[in-house]
Design a protein with these regions (language model features):
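A surface/extracellular/periplasmic glyco- and lipid-processing/surface-interacting theme
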Residues: 180
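Amphipathic coiled-coil alpha-helices
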Residues: 30-33, 37, 72, 88, ...
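Hydrophobic core of alpha-helical transmembrane segments in multi-pass integral membrane proteins
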Residues: 50-55, 75-82
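Cytosolic juxtamembrane N-terminal segments of multi-pass membrane proteins
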Residues: 1-41
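Transmembrane alpha-helical segments and their cytosolic interface motifs
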Residues: 36-52
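Charged, low-complexity intrinsically disordered regions
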Residues: 102, 106-108, 118-176, 184-339
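Transmembrane-cytosolic junction motif
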Residues: 79-104
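Hydrophobic alpha-helical transmembrane segments
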Residues: 45, 58-77
């Protein structure tokens, strides 16, 4: 973790403990309620239904195998319990986060807000650094996807201003839906992970794309040319492309103006902080969109069978929050001159 975040660590721990102490009784009641809900009411009928369903004979089943159906009934019930636990636990965590995160984030700045994914559809369909919504047009104009965005399903959304830089951070799943004339459709996952939108004061006219290198070559849009830097450590991990313009050298010049050694070091630092495999970025019209691909569920608390007052939770949360805010702090995106 960068040293620039050390000044927040102690205040974060104190605030976490304070909020925990104030809310612990009601959170324990909430925890007990969700645990009990696993075995009561409609959930119980769901398990019984799953159990009995497995005993139904198949259409082409000639010889009824009781042992097989007993095995299947047990497996289906286990699967049903897992589904119910996942849904119930998610509801429990979201309720805790709604009361914890808004207060906890004030450690980093008074203007930072949190919105749970369950409240996402109450937001307007516009980019707004206060409402915390990244519109589909921003994703599409970034040119980081080869298909248009049809849906995005955020889990956690953070927005506001940090170090004079407006930002939106959205843990989300982005999907493209292809519809056919017969009424059928196919869904394609375009992205799963953390999307971060930052407003930059430094203006560049060119469109710049950054891709982390992997086993397969990145698919780059037409009319983009590669930019090579003298920093070999960065070149080994990333490919940078700039959109060609009528002024042939302008894109290359602007990319080199933006990508000084400090910028490249900090960009690599963000990649390693979240321990993700793929990362891509679009810099366009005064905004920077960073996509960190990961299947890990970030910004999460302990599940409902663990202690709510486990103070070790704050360490994980602090590391994840600090990784993002340190990126803003060290990149100095609010600067109009240097990075």
């Amino acid at each position: 973790m960068p040293e620039c975040m050390d000044k927040y660590k102690n205040d974060f721990a104190i605030e976490f403990a304070k909020i925990m102490q104030e809310n612990l009784p009601q959170w324990k009641t909430l925890q007990k309620k969700h645990i009990n809900a696993l075995w009561k009411g409609e959930k119980l009928f769901w398990y019984i239904g799953c159990f009995l369903f497995a005993y139904l004979p198949g259409k082409r089943e000639l010889n009824y195998d009781l042992n097989f159906h007993i095995f299947m009934s047990i497996m289906i019930v286990i699967f049903g319990i897992i589904i119910v636990f996942f849904c119930e636990n998610k509801d429990y965590q979201n309720e805790i986060k709604k009361s914890l995160f808004p207060k906890l984030l004030k450690v980093f700045g008074k203007d930072i807000e949190y919105v749970a994914g369950s409240d996402f559809y109450e937001l307007s369909n516009k980019v707004n650094y206060r409402s915390g919504y990244i519109s589909h047009s921003i994703y599409d104009n970034s040119m980081l996807f080869n298909k248009p965005v049809s849906y995005d399903s955020p889990d956690d959304i953070f927005s506001g201003t940090f170090k004079n830089c407006p930002f939106i951070i959205s843990e989300t799943n982005i999907t493209n839906v292809k519809r056919y004339n017969n009424g059928k459709s196919d869904s394609f996952t375009l992205f799963n992970g953390i999307a971060m939108l930052f407003k930059m004061q430094k203006k560049i006219k060119s469109h710049v794309l950054i891709y982390s290198k992997g086993l397969f070559k990145n698919k780059v849009p037409k009319d983009f040319e590669k930019v090579e830097f003298e920093y070999e450590k960065f070149n080994k991990k990333y490919d940078v492309y700039v959109q060609k313009s009528q002024m042939e050298a302008r894109g290359q010049i602007e990319a080199r103006y933006l990508f000084n050694t400090a910028f490249m070091d900090r960009f690599m630092q963000l990649h390693t902080s979240f321990k993700i495999s793929k990362m891509k970025c679009s810099i366009y019209k005064g905004s920077m969109l960073v996509l960190l691909a990961t299947n890990k569920d970030l910004f999460e608390l302990n599940n409902m069978f663990y202690r709510i007052d486990d103070m070790n939770q704050y360490k994980k949360l602090f590391d994840e929050f600090a990784s993002v805010f340190s990126f803003l702090e060290v990149l100095n995106l609010s600067s109009k001159t240097g990075l």
